[in-house]
């Protein structure tokens, strides 16, 4: 233990002083005395010896395990820091490592890092059970074995001999004697000829540590959790229909932080984001190549190796041969022959003693009983189980053995019974529930092995989960099984002359042992009869087993060393095995030592966990003696962290008769069985060794002995020599199995007759593992027989001893470096281990995100841990891992105590934990993601190249044979001269004409929630109501021509009458959505703003709304004294007006159309009379609207196309409109569809909100609707009115769902309009169906269109937005050069049409909107036409389809609004694409919205599930955005359903959401700031 650097090591201390010190250590460790008390007592004990100790050179420490005469047998413990409480969670622990971690942490400056915000309800998230019996669980599948008992590691003197001189020889190879001498004169020095990079690992590490201060500085004392409660009350169901405009404060003080658009921010949120930004501004670790390029500057490339990384320099290794198997004593030809021999010649000899949970021996199985009962079982299996007079089982069939860990006797009988019957036993764990951790994979194993029968005991079967029939339940993923109980009374006695035919010497399968891989898949390793026999013989020779010896077995007897030693080899040697069950170990950790003492056992089989547990429980047990032991086999010696348990155990129990040479670590793997085992000196074993290795070197697969730099080292002990008769070599991990160099870590491979032979039934993966052919550098095979890969990583050291530094299953490869999961666990536990992690339960694994392994650490926190503790611990763990391993942790999650899935005999079920993490069912209570520091292989930020000029672009397109992207709707017939055109120029004239010619023709029908007609309007009724409104405006309102009037009405006929009333008296109407009574605070300011901004001289409304506008509640939201005149039109007198106002010119303003954009900008556009009638005419032609038609409209009537369809089109075309207010659907979802069916509407319009409501609300009710007679076969076109990219998923699911009600598959389409032109595209009744194309989303980010096949990676479906309307011309122009673009090129959609709006009346929220929106000209080509810029990106594509006019059809595809796009890393992202990915990430995500804040991407998700599941989403959201969009999410905000504001068109108001977030008004469930 040279690395412990203990100054006390050379001083002889009397045994009683050593014992007192050990007890003192333990009292401190269990919290019985304080640190101060401990130091006082310790000083007193050591006072007499201190002078002897001072000044001894540590390099002179003795290094042999077997003490010579001059050496004493133990040393005093080192002084340690206090450990607050007693617990058994001290795993993976080592003093040196703990000190290293604390030293590393001390180097960090305290930096501010934002602490996650959590709602109080989420804080109350306690453990499943606050206390369970001690169960130290490890992150490895080795049942929690890996612990480094911390303060108990009093460094023993009989320390291992050092590996350093050997390694130096190895690396030098044939270096000269002078360099060798120079090396030997400096312990651990390097030859002068070695490259400088390798020569100074210490210096390099110091530099690295200095560099550490440049990043990951994390504040350990952040602000307390940000708990925001009750700020905004949102109903769970009703989404606030926010159309409110973002108010812009004027004249704010300069010091006040403002958002990009001037929203004042003084909240905690923004200060946290500031902290986060400050953290992120620090430089990242530089050496890794940060970016990559490909044809799209997009494919992630492998990171380039660091030129300074250590490289192996030794010579090539060779095959290491174990000693030959001794011929010696003649042995029986097979294990069954041996069993028969002992069963008949030594029937009374004890074979196996089973203990109960109190430690009492409940039954001793003799060899006679084992033989007779196994025979009985074999006979029963072969002769008494029949189906249809056929024997159920044939030789070679596989049979599952399901026995609890407490019943070794029945297991042994079953195992040998199967062997005698020539059946193949497949031992598995007892299933405890229907859905145990890993149950599905056990099912896969049973299925792949073709198992259909399971053997068990009566007691065990009673305890299995049952189905309602009383039968054993069907377990998740398992094949159908028959269960056979094999207790004595169920077995038949064989006739005297019956003998089994067992052939058990050849290559036939003897048994199958299960193995769970890193990814969680469970496979069966086939062990042949020959291998089984060879293994027993090799173990007998290596361990020197002899007849009638007693072995105490603490391991699981169903598999691994517990099976090989305790069930198989023991029988070969007629040994007596005392089996200690797991339950007894948990109740009394000293039980195995007591049994060793009681039975005078010569050998014991344990794991380091068992040694550690007994250390914690050994006080007061002075009467135990371990002097009978000649071998204490440590089965998990292959775990590098087992060394501490071994040393600490020896330190304490040496005084109780334990000899140092007795401790024998071994290494094994399911595929190769036992690989190596340390032999005691009397069996010819060399002295034990240990190596202190640089973790940095190991991460590059290179062995470097570390001397100076103790911060990141791994101390490993040898696992002895290879097995007798085996050949072992070390090969490279990836690619062809080339032999490693002597100073290189590789995978240990074994060639021997005693290994497994295959993965049962899985030929594909068998070949790679069981038939490896290692080759030399020159490519020549090294041996004539194939090797088996063990999955163990290590090297061959001095004296041909094997050293293991990790397992392939625990390997995480980040970039070019390799890290071992167990090492990371050890580092995390060294950070205040006792205080925080519940029973040391930590799982570390890697997940692949963006083509690289990312490290995830999950720990159980103590039930009493506060938020502050959690955050502080997480911060420190990140620093420690960064410092010790130089690697970032991608995600750190804390879960409540007792919630991680457990492996069968203790330990954490890693693969199940990983599965839950990826599925979002882990339910953490704290999460910290650090993608910014870990993800260094993002694509290169896009550098904008100087653009090609517009002229060159046109020429380029011509040369390429591409047409200019331009398209137009049908030509409008020249009706300007005719009567009708003049007559239809003004809508007021049209209404009067209709009232005169067809007075009783019904125009409007308004439905309520019950589907009954609440009001109607014929032509004459509407005319008369309009006259009354006009008279009231002129008389009561005293308005003059040209005044603006705000119409604040709920959807209905009153609104239409008020509109025409305004036209009749020459006023300009402005439709405004009335405020929501339950949500006045957010909706009333918008009303007030539109009234003020539109300069309305009067407000027309109903009595109910008038009361609302003047109410006390309204006064709290706005200044109600400043309303203009408010007129209610409920009871206005019947009056005529002298004459209807006729505008002097068609270009006079007809109405103002105000709308809030999704970016929160309130924009009003001017519509002239000419544009209004042109709009109506275009829609009439496209939809073939005549007076005989009925159309159903379920839209909000306040702006855009919704307003035009509700108020204008019926009057112009004369068709009847069935009006369905969308609000009514909240109380009757089927209202709209029932109306469509009832009125047999051929054409219907709705919004996305309506469509979504129907899809979600009526999904399960189509049958009920059909019975009510709802039939949608009348519909020819159902159009979604939208100002966005078509939502394909929604329209498709709507079509699919209502196909059952007769809705034609081709009926659903979308419209497209925007502020400059409310109706550009609309499907109509004629022409081809809308087409869908698939584009590459990555190309889209670079403003390019690349058409791909459906289903190809990164493909995005885009549906054509209906057909271009008559009279409308569209061209695609470059956003910056304003030049025309070619077919299928992405650019801004420009539109020219008689119904374009004539300009903005006003824009509020961003006054700098360009004046050229309505009067743009191309910079090249046709520079005369006046175009309006829509502000939307899209492309035109000529299809193969034929238009109504006979020409080829041009399809317009809308990609998204330019205002909404996010510019990140030089690329253009559309929020909807990121949101779609996020919504797909987890079933609990109901809705999602993204926005940026100071270059950080903020993702807000609505959680439709339990609050305690909220944190599952953080990692999934981060993963999916990285994977699919190559973006790092900065902040994840989890909110309640309905928090994301949505406008009447169903569009997300992302900027309102952003303002709400920054002003701390969202009342989030959780806010995670990704580091």
UniProtKB/Swiss-Prot annotation:
It is an enzyme of class 6 (ligase). Disulfide bonds: none annotated. It is found in: Cell membrane; Mitochondrion; Cell projection, Dendritic spine. Residues 86-98 have a biased composition (Basic and acidic residues). GO terms for molecular function: acetate-CoA ligase activity. It comes from the Eukaryota. Residues 60-203, 302-327 are annotated as: Disordered. Residues 9-127 form the DMAP1-binding domain. GO terms for cellular component: cell surface; dendritic spine; membrane; mitochondrion; plasma membrane. This is Disco-interacting protein 2 homolog A. It comes from Homo sapiens (Human). The lineage of its organism: Eukaryota, Metazoa, Chordata, Craniata, Vertebrata. The gene is DIP2A.
């Amino acid at each position: 233990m040279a690395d412990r650097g203990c100054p006390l090591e050379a001083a002889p201390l009397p045994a009683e002083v050593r014992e007192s010190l050990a007890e003192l250590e333990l009292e401190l460790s269990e919290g019985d005395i304080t640190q101060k008390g401990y130091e006082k007592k310790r000083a007193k004990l050591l006072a007499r010896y201190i002078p002897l100790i001072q000044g001894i050179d540590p390099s002179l420490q003795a290094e042999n395990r077997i003490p010579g005469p001059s050496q004493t047998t133990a040393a005093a413990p080192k002084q340690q820091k206090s450990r607050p409480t007693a617990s058994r969670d001290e795993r993976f622990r080592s003093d040196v490592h703990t000190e290293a971690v604390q030293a590393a942490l001390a180097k960090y400056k305290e930096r501010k890092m934002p602490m996650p915000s959590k709602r109080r309800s989420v804080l109350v998230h306690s453990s499943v059970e606050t206390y369970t019996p001690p169960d130290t669980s490890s992150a490895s599948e080795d049942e929690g074995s890996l612990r480094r008992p911390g303060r108990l590691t009093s460094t023993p003197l009989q320390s291992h001999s050092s590996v350093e001189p050997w390694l130096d020889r190895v690396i030098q190879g044939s270096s000269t004697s002078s360099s060798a001498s120079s090396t030997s004169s400096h312990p651990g020095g390097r030859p002068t000829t070695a490259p400088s990079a390798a020569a100074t690992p210490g210096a390099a590490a110091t530099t690295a540590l200095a560099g550490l201060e440049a990043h990951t500085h994390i504040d350990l004392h952040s602000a307390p959790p940000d708990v925001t409660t009750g700020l905004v009350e949102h109903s769970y169901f009703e989404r606030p229909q926010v159309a409110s405009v973002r108010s812009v404060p004027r004249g704010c003080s300069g010091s006040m932080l403002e958002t990009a658009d001037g929203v004042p921010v003084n909240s905690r949120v923004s200060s946290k984001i500031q902290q986060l930004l400050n953290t992120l501004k620090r430089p990242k670790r530089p050496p890794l190549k940060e970016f990559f390029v490909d044809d799209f500057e997009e494919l992630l490339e492998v990171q380039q190796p660091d030129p300074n990384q250590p490289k192996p320099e030794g010579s090539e290794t060779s095959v290491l041969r174990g000693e030959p198997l001794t011929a010696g004593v003649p042995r029986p030809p097979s294990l069954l022959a041996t069993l028969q021999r002992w069963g008949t010649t030594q029937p009374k000899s004890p074979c196996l003693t089973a203990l109960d949970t109190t430690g009492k021996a409940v039954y001793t199985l003799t060899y006679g009983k084992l033989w007779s009962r196994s025979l009985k079982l074999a006979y029963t299996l072969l002769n008494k189980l029949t189906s249809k007079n056929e024997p159920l089982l044939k030789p070679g069939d596989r049979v599952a053995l399901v026995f609890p860990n407490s019943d070794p006797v029945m297991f042994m009988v079953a195992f040998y019974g199967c062997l005698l019957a020539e059946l193949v036993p497949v031992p598995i764990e007892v299933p405890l529930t229907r859905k145990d951790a890993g149950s599905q994979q056990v099912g896969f194993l049973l299925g792949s092995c073709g198992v259909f029968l399971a053997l068990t005991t009566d007691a065990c079967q009673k305890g299995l989960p049952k189905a309602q029939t009383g039968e054993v339940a069907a377990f998740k993923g398992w094949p159908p099984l028959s269960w056979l109980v094999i207790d004595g009374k169920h077995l038949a006695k064989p006739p005297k002359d019956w003998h089994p035919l067992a052939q058990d010497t050849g290559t036939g399968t003897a048994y199958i042992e299960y193995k769970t891989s890193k990814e969680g898949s469970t496979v069966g390793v086939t062990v042949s009869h020959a291998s089984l026999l060879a293994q027993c013989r090799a173990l007998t020779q290596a361990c020197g087993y002899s007849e009638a010896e007693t072995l105490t077995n603490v391991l699981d007897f169903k598999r691994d060393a517990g099976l090989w030693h305790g069930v198989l080899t023991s029988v070969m040697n007629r040994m007596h095995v005392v089996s200690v069950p797991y339950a007894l170990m948990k109740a009394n950790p000293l039980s195995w030592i007591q049994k060793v003492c009681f039975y005078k056992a010569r050998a014991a089989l344990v794991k380091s966990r068992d040694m550690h547990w007994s250390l914690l429980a050994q006080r007061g047990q002075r009467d135990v003696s371990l002097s009978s032991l000649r071998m204490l086999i440590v089965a998990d010696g292959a775990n590098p962290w087992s060394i501490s348990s071994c040393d600490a155990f020896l330190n304490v129990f040496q005084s109780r008769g334990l000899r140092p040479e007795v401790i024998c670590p071994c290494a094994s793997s399911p595929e190769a069985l036992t690989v190596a085992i340390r032999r005691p000196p009397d069996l010819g074993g060399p002295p034990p060794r240990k190596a202190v290795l640089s973790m940095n070197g190991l991460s590059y697969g290179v062995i470097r002995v570390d001397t100076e730099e103790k911060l990141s080292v791994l101390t490993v002990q040898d696992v002895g020599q290879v097995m007798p008769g085996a050949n072992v070599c070390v090969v490279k991990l990836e690619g062809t199995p080339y032999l490693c160099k002597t100073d290189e870590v590789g995978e240990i491979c074994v060639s021997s007759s005693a290994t497994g032979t295959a993965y049962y039934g899985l030929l594909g993966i068998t070949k790679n593992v069981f038939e490896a052919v290692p080759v030399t550098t020159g490519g020549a095979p090294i041996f004539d027989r194939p090797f088996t890969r063990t999955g163990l990583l290590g090297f061959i050291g001095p004296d041909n001893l094997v050293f293991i530094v990790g397992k392939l299953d625990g390997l995480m490869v980040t970039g070019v470096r390799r890290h071992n999961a167990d090492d990371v666990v050890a580092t995390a536990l060294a950070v205040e281990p006792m205080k925080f992690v519940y029973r040391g339960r930590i799982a570390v694994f890697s997940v692949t995100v963006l083509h690289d392994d990312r490290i995830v650490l999950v720990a159980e926190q103590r039930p009493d841990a506060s938020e502050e503790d959690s955050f502080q611990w997480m911060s420190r763990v990140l620093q420690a891992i960064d410092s010790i391993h130089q690697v970032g942790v991608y995600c750190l999650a804390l879960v409540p105590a007792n919630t991680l899935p457990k492996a069968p005999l203790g330990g954490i079920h890693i693969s199940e934990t990983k599965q839950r993490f990826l599925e979002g069912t882990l339910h953490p209570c704290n999460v910290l993601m650090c993608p910014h520091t870990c993800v260094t292989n993002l694509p290169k930020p896009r550098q904008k190249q100087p653009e090609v000029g517009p002229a060159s672009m046109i020429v380029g397109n011509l040369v390429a044979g591409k047409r200019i992207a331009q398209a137009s709707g049908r030509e409008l017939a020249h009706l300007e001269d005719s009567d009708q055109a003049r007559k239809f120029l003004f809508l007021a004239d049209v209404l009067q004409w209709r009232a005169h010619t067809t007075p009783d023709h019904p125009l409007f029908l308004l439905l309520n929630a019950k589907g009954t007609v609440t009001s109607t309007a014929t032509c004459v009724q509407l005319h008369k109501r309009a006259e009354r409104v006009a008279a009231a405006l002129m008389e009561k309102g005293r308005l003059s021509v040209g005044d603006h009037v705000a119409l604040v009405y709920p959807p209905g006929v009153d609104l239409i009458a008020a509109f025409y009333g305004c036209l009749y008296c020459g006023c300009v109407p402005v439709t405004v959505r009335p405020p929501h009574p339950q949500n006045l605070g957010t909706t009333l300011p918008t009303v007030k703003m539109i009234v003020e901004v539109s300069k309305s001289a009067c407000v027309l409304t109903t009595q109910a709304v008038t009361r609302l506008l003047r109410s006390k509640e309204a006064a709290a939201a706005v200044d109600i004294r400043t309303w203009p005149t408010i007129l209610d039109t409920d009871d206005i007198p019947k009056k005529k007006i002298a004459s209807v106002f006729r505008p002097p010119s068609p270009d006079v303003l007809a109405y103002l159309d105000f709308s809030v954009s999704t970016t929160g900008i309130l924009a009003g556009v001017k519509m002239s009379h000419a544009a209004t009638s042109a709009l109506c005419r275009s829609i009439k032609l496209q939809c073939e609207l005549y007076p005989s038609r009925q159309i159903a409209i379920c839209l909000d009537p306040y702006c855009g196309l919704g307003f035009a369809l509700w108020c204008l089109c019926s009057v112009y075309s004369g068709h009847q409109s069935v009006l369905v207010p969308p609000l009514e659907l909240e109380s009757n979802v089927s209202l709209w569809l029932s109306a469509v069916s009832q009125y047999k509407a051929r054409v219907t319009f709705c919004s996305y909100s309506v469509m979504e409501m129907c899809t979600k609300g009526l999904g399960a009710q189509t049958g009920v609707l059909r019975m009510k007679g709802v039939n949608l076969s009348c519909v020819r076109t159902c159009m979604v009115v939208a100002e966005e990219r078509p939502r394909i998923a929604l329209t498709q699911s709507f079509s699919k769902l209502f196909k059952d009600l007769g809705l034609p598959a081709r009926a659903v389409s979308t419209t497209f309009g925007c502020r400059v032109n409310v109706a550009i595209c609309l499907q109509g009744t004629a022409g081809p169906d809308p087409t869908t194309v698939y584009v590459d989303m990555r190309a889209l980010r670079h403003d390019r269109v690349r058409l791909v096949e459906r289903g190809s990676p990164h493909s995005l479906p885009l549906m054509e937005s209906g057909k271009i309307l008559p009279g409308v011309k569209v061209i695609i122009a470059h956003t910056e050069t304003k030049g025309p673009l070619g077919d299928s090129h992405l650019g801004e959609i420009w539109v020219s049409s008689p119904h374009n709006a004539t300009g903005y009346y006003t824009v509020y929220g961003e006054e700098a909107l360009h004046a050229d929106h309505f009067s743009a000209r191309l910079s090249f080509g046709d520079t005369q036409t006046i175009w309006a810029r829509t502000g939307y990106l899209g492309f035109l594509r000529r299809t193969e389809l034929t238009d109504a006019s006979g020409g080829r059809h041009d399809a317009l595809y809308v990609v998204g609004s330019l205002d909404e796009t996010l510019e990140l890393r030089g690329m253009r992202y559309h929020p909807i694409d990121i949101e779609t990915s996020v919504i797909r990430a987890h079933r609990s995500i109901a809705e999602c919205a993204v926005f940026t804040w100071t270059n950080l991407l903020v993702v807000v998700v609505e959680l439709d599930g339990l609050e305690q599941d909220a944190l599952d989403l953080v990692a999934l959201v981060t993963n999916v955005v990285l994977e699919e969009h190559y973006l790092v999410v900065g902040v994840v905000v989890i909110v309640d359903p309905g928090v994301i504001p949505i406008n009447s068109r169903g569009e997300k108001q992302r900027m309102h959401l952003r303002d709400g977030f920054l002003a701390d008004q969202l009342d989030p469930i959780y806010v995670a700031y990704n580091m």
